[in-house]
């Protein structure tokens, strides 16, 4: 079972560039919460997500918008790339797009080591082989797991030993294996989460607790073994209280214990004893971990991106869809009402085109450059963490991420409804240092009558949780339908020189419509930067077709290039690949944060002799480099 892992080396891996995450883990900060119940520094949230069946996870996105495009990173501390099976493989490393999106938002991602129950094809020999020492007394599989995580760029392993039939000697060897895994990985920032299954007898006996039978996999006499423990679903209020107390006695944090919350089949209708985990009064008892929150997509009959994000917003924010105004307490305790959100928007330049990482089309500068559906989380923007804080003295409009039009990527922020009073929509929580040259830019459009748009910049935080954000408002002008020509989009700019030397803590927009008219207004992009943008990023180097197969006028090919050098804006944010058509037009084929992309089923255009491809580097402000070209010849 472990032969392929034992023999793996990055030097011999032909798929390495396709599977390697490149975005470093961003630092996070915690703004003042928008409500009085969310707490900072207490319970945390882990999320165990199956993005696709084990063998069905694409390396770099796929041609469908029907995908669990998670965007509520602000509430998550750790994401487990859930999967593994006896028939498909029991070690599952996360794909690069998920890791890149998570890291951009400061979230760690763990791969999964799954030793399945015998009833699901498990074999105790696999467990024994996993924890076997070599002739020098080392654990070679532990060393390889660390090597894989470091090479592919993710953050550690979730270890789930559910194959029954072991004994205490096997349990001891498992604990020693975890220690070796930790010793090899900790210097590189890697983490271990242990699932509450195997106990110190070597048998599988889910405790629903941290207790004397399983604590040695978390903390033994020599110190820390695992960083966190995922406490099985069998927990009770009493066992969680006892678990937290034991963690305290061991000198560890009770918030390193994830109480399992099963949302796979019922989502927000799940029967959860919330007060046993995160009581409204008193300290949080432990943290919690969602099992399969992708229910927000899987339960839908309408699997469109818009329907998914509406459901996902309700799951994370609550029924009110406004974290500053939580709905009356019901059976579902939304994370936004429990855990303080976090952000990574702490440096210039910053830009967001409200791209969720999937879409029905691909847009560039307001024009469609591909009409094919797609997903790739590595292309996702850092989106506002609070969906959506809306302030108005009149009727509340609809505020959504919408996929019918976009400035760049696949989506935009849509505000629609009758504006009977000015409407403020909170956007990003930030820590942006402002200078005399700082400017804020909005790319926006209206499909209705004229509106006045102002941008809000808060140079201090609210005085307490639940208090309003104190914005300073800057006028950007008025716009009406068609004001920007063919695409309907226009760019508005406001100088931030009056705020120089201060820090921007939050950004917002305020929209006013004359006479309370119905409004359809889109925000396509938001950016804050210093000074004029005149220099493009450096182009990628040496693009090449590494392999190709041709059949019936189509080609399946592997494309690669060398990383562009760091330009004036630093390393590229990502790369984009286009097809150059015989008439000179361009069609978007895909993007990646890495330096390789698989292109399936590229059709021949007429009788062209070769398909020409362009690769461009894209920086943090979405400026694009000059193209680097390569071509694939068609057979006569």
Residue ranges and their predicted role:
Residues 1-22, 257, 261-396:
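Substrate-binding cleft of secreted/luminal carbohydrate-active enzymes
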Residues 38-242:
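Chitinase-like catalytic core of GlcNAc-active glycosidases
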Residues 395-424, 478-483, 583:
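Short carbohydrate-recognition loop motifs
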Residues 413, 417, 425-455, 492-495, ...:
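Extra-cytoplasmic beta-strand recognition segments
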Residues 450-452, 564-586, 607-608:
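Solvent-exposed loop/turn segments flanking beta-strands in beta-repeat/beta-sandwich domains
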Residues 464-503:
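Extracellular carbohydrate recognition and processing domains
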Residues 552-570:
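Conserved aromatic anchor
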Residues 597-631:
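Beta-strand-rich modules
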